[in-house]
Amino acid sequence: MINTQGEEGSLRKKVWNTINLIQANQLFVHSKNIEIKYFDEVKNKTNIKILPEILSLCVLNALVPNSAMLLVGGHGGGKTTLVKLLGRMFTGMRLEEIENSIVRGHPQLTEEKLTGTLKLGKLMKDGTEEVVWRQFVTGFWKIIDEVNRLTPYSQDILLSLLAEGKVKYYDAITTVEKYTLYSTINPQDVGTFELSQPFLDRFGISVPISMPSSNDLSLILTGKDEKYTGYDELIEVPKILSIDALMEIWYYVNRMRFKTEVNNYIHAIIRECTLCARVDKGNSENLRPSSGLCSGCHFNTDINICNKIDSILSVRVAKDLLRYSKALAWLMDLNEVDVNIVNSIAPYVISHRVNYRERELEKAPFWGNKYEFTKHIIEIVNKRYFNRKPCYDIATRFRDGVPNEKDLDTLSDYAKNDLIVKYDILPFCKAVKAKKYAKLAVKIDKSVKSGDLTSLTQVRDTLINDLEFPNRAYLINWCDQELYKQTVSDFTFKYSHQKDVWVEIATEFPNLDQPIKEALSKRQTKQIRTEDVLIETNVTGTDESSIVNIQISGGANALKLRSLLESLEYLEKE
């Protein structure tokens, strides 16, 4: 039997051990810290935990599936060394292997040196183009040193990897299923190229690397000289985790719950930075706050965000805010993500992806520091979000089909000074005030409270076929979420039983034969969706002892599948 709770706790302890070991052995010395605010449910109050900023954020990046991170700072700050050591500890790869897979950015770096080369023997003998992929492409732990020295063409190759998980060379295409990527950047370096906004947007998080303080330098100088002795891979930089273990951590991180207000708050961050009363910032080429767009505008005040930002924030930013918040909440062993956790991580997720109005950015006390200015922006967003709280409550009542008589009047008052209420909340509430919407919303609510899965499934099927129903997407999602909550079941088994599981499921559900077979065939995470069943599989590795997670949710067939899996003695139900 597999003790999944003990396994999760053991994995978390190993991650903390990595942080402690790097600090204790002085493998990376930097005194700058990050304050993490979180709500302690036991003591019923908000607490603060102090963590080493650079090291902790680099570790968080490894806990997020298929993640990419930018380390921004001058040369000699230990950026590349740190991620090499983390690669050794998190994957068990030798330092020499990690070194061989590093891409060193420079303008002469060709596509062949970055991605792969043709097998010359086959090409000359048979005329066949067979690609031998570079270790950077095939390896799990990827490092790009000085990414801003890559030409725009080389950046496009990496963009394909980050955006689609695919790399192309000649007519060959390889899929990069799972990876963790780190890129270093020295903004002051000569001979560099500008990184495009779409390219920067693919990096989920970034951290500024400042030079060590006097005390840090003292510790560094009195410590061991790695140039002379090297690193002891058994004691100083031991293997603590493996790729299989990291895949298991990804599964646990993805399952982290988050409060409803976190959903609203992340929306607020994105929309505060994107909305404008005059133009669509995403499609406006010349009109920007920095070019005089905000002159004479009613919303051009110190308490607004829109007049301080030239660019927009993409949907990817919203997803990354949640991903990294989940990773941080999991690492701190919290039950769920709250707004405090999002606030702690937001400056590092946003700062490298946004273009601020220079006049605002260069004011005291920021002096051009995008990270500090982003923290200031998040503080404003936070205040405005809590001032707007009654409007979210009104929107919830409209969603549930039970609005109050004066709710629209209240929203109209807020809309005079709040762009989110004016362009998002108020139009939404007006759109769903129809009687047929309220009637169906109340029906869904009753089905939820009574646990009537059949009724929920019927409502969902009706909505799928009715393209004109107001706020249809929300109601379908509501049904899906409630079906998920009432039927979700998690199972764990060893990879040695993957064929048995496949046969059992395929025998009872022939339509799942091929999808299940493919999902369990290699290390990967897959979702399989039928009309009323959602299956998520997570194969951490293909060794006999590797752990496989499978989650079932949906309607009547999901319950039938759950009963089948519960009857298998080699499966552990969580």
Stretch-by-stretch model annotation:
Residues G76, T81, N283-F491, Y495-I516, ...:
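C-terminal engagement/docking regions of AAA+ P-loop ATPases
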Residues L60, V64-G105:
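Walker A/P-loop
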Residues H106-V137:
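Short glycine-rich substrate-engagement loop in P-loop NTPases that contacts/grips substrate
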Residues E7-G74:
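Pre-Walker A (pre-P-loop) alpha-helix and adjacent loop at the N terminus of AAA/AAA+ ATPase modules
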Residues E8-K32, I209-C297, L334:
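Conserved C-terminal "switch" segment of AAA+ ATPases
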Residues L21-N25, N61-P65, M89-M93, T117-G121, ...:
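Conserved, well-folded catalytic cores of nucleic-acid-processing
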Residues V64-N66, G77, F136-T138, T175-Y179:
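Short loop/turn elements that form and flank the Walker-type P-loop nucleotide-binding site
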Residues M69, F90, G121-M124, W141, ...:
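Canonical AAA+ ATPase core
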